[in-house]
Amino acid sequence: MTGLFVTLEGPEGAGKSTNRDYLAERLRERGVEVQLTREPGGTPLAERIRELLLAPSDEPMAADTELLLMFAARAQHIAGVIRPALARGAVVLCDRFTDATYAYQGGGRGLPEARIAALESFVQGDLRPDLTLVFDLPVEIGLARAAARGRLDRFEQEDRRFFEAVRQTYLQRAAQAPQRYQVLDAGLPLAEVQAGLDRLLPNLLERLHG
């Protein structure tokens, strides 16, 4: 049995975690096994790498160091959580995955796409999301939401130019592969965003059981 791999992407403050939990609840109501997870993180070791990546530090982190740590955490996460859950037939709902690496380390940091693609192939093999939900939001709104949550992590402290590049990379990737991506307007009221998720449910269930 093979499950379904769904990733949720978007900039800071876009509501990915809230909507991931909502989608999980709706799927579980229909008797579907759901594996909730996130990146970077998802296993104890990967969560320790997450701490390194997010904690502000007096020592600047080189962009390639950041990239390699992301994929180190991802390798552990895939082996320990994602592949086993898919093998059980579960729906994996993952808050960020490799699209975030293209957006943040590629778009934001300016690292070559080919470098990211090489690591993607090495670490993931043929594993790719079945569906990616991109929660799109104007940068200023996302940053205001992130600031309202309290202390900012290392990424949230980046400037507007960084996040504009992140947003545009997400939208470009979605436009290049519309069969895999669904872009949702995260600036709408939460109830409207979640109504959009409800409309996706029949297709998700058909793909899972089809």
UniProtKB/Swiss-Prot annotation:
One GO MF term attached to the UniProt entry: dTMP kinase activity
Source organism (scientific name): Pseudomonas paraeruginosa (strain DSM 24068 / PA7) (Pseudomonas aeruginosa (strain PA7))
Gene behind the chain: tmk
Gene3D superfamilies reported for this sequence: P-loop containing nucleotide triphosphate hydrolases
A cellular component term, taken from the record's GO annotations: cytosol
UniProt keyword terms in alphabetical order: ATP-binding, Kinase, Nucleotide biosynthesis, Nucleotide-binding, Transferase
Similarity section: Belongs to the thymidylate kinase family.
Residues reported to bind ATP: G10, P11, E12, G13, A14, G15, K16, S17
Catalytic activity: dTMP + ATP = dTDP + ADP
EC category name: transferase
Name of the protein in its database record: Thymidylate kinase
